[in-house]
UniProtKB/Swiss-Prot annotation:
<feature type="binding site">
    <location>
        <position position="133"/>
    </location>
    <ligand>
        <name>(6S)-5,6,7,8-tetrahydrofolate</name>
    </ligand>
</feature>
<comment type="similarity">
    <text>Belongs to the SHMT family.</text>
</comment>
<dbReference type="InterPro" id="IPR001085">
    <property type="entry name" value="Ser_HO-MeTrfase"/>
</dbReference>
<dbReference type="InterPro" id="IPR019798">
    <property type="entry name" value="Ser_HO-MeTrfase_PLP_BS"/>
</dbReference>
<dbReference type="InterPro" id="IPR015422">
    <property type="entry name" value="PyrdxlP-dep_Trfase_small"/>
</dbReference>
<dbReference type="GO" id="GO:0019264">
    <property type="term" value="P:glycine biosynthetic process from serine"/>
</dbReference>
<dbReference type="Pfam" id="PF00464">
    <property type="entry name" value="SHMT"/>
</dbReference>
<comment type="function">
    <text>Catalyzes the reversible interconversion of serine and glycine with tetrahydrofolate (THF) serving as the one-carbon carrier. This reaction serves as the major source of one-carbon groups required for the biosynthesis of purines, thymidylate, methionine, and other important biomolecules. Also exhibits THF-independent aldolase activity toward beta-hydroxyamino acids, producing glycine and aldehydes, via a retro-aldol mechanism.</text>
</comment>
<keyword id="KW-0663">Pyridoxal phosphate</keyword>
<feature type="binding site">
    <location>
        <begin position="137"/>
        <end position="139"/>
    </location>
    <ligand>
        <name>(6S)-5,6,7,8-tetrahydrofolate</name>
    </ligand>
</feature>
<comment type="pathway">
    <text>Amino-acid biosynthesis; glycine biosynthesis; glycine from L-serine: step 1/1.</text>
</comment>
<protein>
    <recommendedName>
        <fullName>Serine hydroxymethyltransferase</fullName>
        <ecNumber>2.1.2.1</ecNumber>
    </recommendedName>
</protein>
<keyword id="KW-0808">Transferase</keyword>
<dbReference type="InterPro" id="IPR015421">
    <property type="entry name" value="PyrdxlP-dep_Trfase_major"/>
</dbReference>
<dbReference type="InterPro" id="IPR039429">
    <property type="entry name" value="SHMT-like_dom"/>
</dbReference>
<dbReference type="GO" id="GO:0005829">
    <property type="term" value="C:cytosol"/>
</dbReference>
<dbReference type="GO" id="GO:0035999">
    <property type="term" value="P:tetrahydrofolate interconversion"/>
</dbReference>
Length: 438
């Protein structure tokens, strides 16, 4: 073997066999530190969850090497016979999970799935209705800073000021006045049951499409803990992470063949090129997990835990927007503790409790300050936390907020936060992740 060939072989051996730690210790270190953070902190961000080792393995597989523009059986590249199997499994499992006739599993994110529906069903300048961001909607539901708010005429609906619940008569009124081409239901911070049937009645009355973004509650729908929008909506979108407990990505479902064709064309070639086949593999694995009987128990536990956490927080003098929760999340009004969301998020973070500041309906504070935090139970429930643990977590949150109230500063109360942090580490140590003890 020549010296050049030997060098090439040696380089190839390193390329295919060296570990991440050997090749890039900086990235390896960041990942290791993030794993430590996830192990030792309580994750209460409602849009986050913990995937299984099987999902991690699928998403980290050699499928990342394969380009597969198009759809199964109709690709623009050769060598797609095995990734076709992967995508077809993901589609069939999603159909079974949600009772939908047509599914597109290619959207790379929640924003892109919603953009695909807009591209398929609307023209620039068309009118659509969506839940106002301040009432628990999403940026892609018509926020003026988002493409959805820039390209279309948006009419927002919101919650009532007295009880923070949706008033369906106040959804119907602007729909009749504005005759939107599409009505979008669903949100990111609404803790009550959605009346899909009434939304469809309103949509039919004004001749609009009904689109449901069930990204936050898809796992609860799959697990039988929230009514399904699929029989009512013309088209549904959902992320595949959050309560569904899969990899980060999006999905679109419909029972209408004509809409399905438009959706497929909007996703590819309208918005995306080659799909992320390693992510689609992770989606397929997560759907298989969600089809198992134990996922129904998981979904029930998510809701039970959320209700327990909300009641515990109320017992410590905090207000819960709309008075409680019927799903996996809650908005906590911090004003009884004289705290802002910004301060509370930072103080809880120092105590190893992760959440996000969040505006509450009719919030007097600025968006980067807020009067509330949003809390969710999917990740903690995946870890194995039950009602007892979430009651303890509620008490720990109140302890931090009471300390923050006494300190009345951005720095918080170091002694209280350290004491809570030690309790959190003890709690998380009883529920190891990925086979790790301690």
């Amino acid at each position: 073997m020549s010296q050049a060939n030997a060098a090439t072989k040696a380089s190839s051996d390193v390329f295919f066999n060296a570990s991440l730690e050997d090749i890039d210790p900086e990235i390896f270190g960041a990942i290791r530190n993030e794993l430590g953070r996830q192990r030792h902190e309580i994750e209460l961000i409602a849009s986050e969850n913990i995937v299984s080792r099987a999902v991690l393995e699928a998403q980290g597989s050699i499928l990342t090497n394969k380009y597969a523009e198009g759809y199964p059986g109709k690709r623009y590249y050769g060598g797609c016979q095995y990734v076709d199997v992967v995508e077809e499994l993901a589609i069939e499992r999603a159909k079974k999970l949600f009772g939908a006739e047509f599914v597109n599993v290619q959207p790379n994110s929640g924003s892109q799935m919603n953009q695909a529906v807009f591209l398929a069903l609307l023209q620039p300048g068309d009118t659509f209705m969506g839940l106002d961001l301040n009432s628990g909607g999403h940026l892609t539901h018509g926020s003026p800073v988002n493409m959805s708010g820039k390209w279309f005429n948006v009419v927002s609906y919101g919650v009532r000021k007295d009880d923070h619940l949706l008033d369906m008569d106040e959804v119907a009124r602007p729909a009749r006045e504005n005759k939107p081409k599409l009505i979008l239901a669903g949100g990111t911070a609404y803790s009550r049951i959605w009346d899909w049937k009434r939304f469809r009645e309103i949509a039919d009355e004004v001749g609009a499409y009904l689109m449901v973004d069930m990204a936050h509650i898809a796992g609860l729908v799959a697990g039988g803990q929230h009514p399904s929008p699929v029989p009512h909506a013309h088209v549904c979108t959902t992320t595949t992470h959050k309560s569904l407990r899969g990899p980060r990505g999006g999905m679109i479902l419909t029972n209408d063949a004509d809409i399905a064709k438009k959706i497929n064309s909007a996703v590819f070639p309208g918005l995306q090129g080659g799909p992320l086949m390693h992510v689609i593999a992770g989606k397929a694995v997560a759907f298989a997990e969600a089809l198992k009987p134990e996922f129904k128990l998981y979904a029930k536990n998510v809701v039970d835990n959320a209700r327990a956490l909300a009641e515990e927080l109320k017992s410590h003098g905090l207000d819960i927007v709309s008075g409680g929760t019927d799903n996996h999340l809650m908005l906590v009004d911090l004003r009884p503790k004289n705290a802002t969301g910004k301060r509370a998020e930072a103080a809880l973070g120092r105590a190893n409790i992760t959440c996000n500041k969040n505006g509450i309906p009719f919030d007097p504070e600025k968006p980067f300050v807020t009067s509330g935090v949003r809390l969710g139970t999917p990740a903690g429930t995946t870890r194995g936390f039950g009602v007892a643990e979430f009651k303890e977590i509620g008490s720990l949150i109140a302890e931090v907020l009471d300390g923050l109230k006494v300190a009345n500063s951005d720095e918080g109360n170091a002694a209280v936060e350290q004491a809570v942090k030690e309790k959190v580490i003890a709690l998380t140590g009883r529920f190891p992740m990925y086979g790790y003890q301690g």
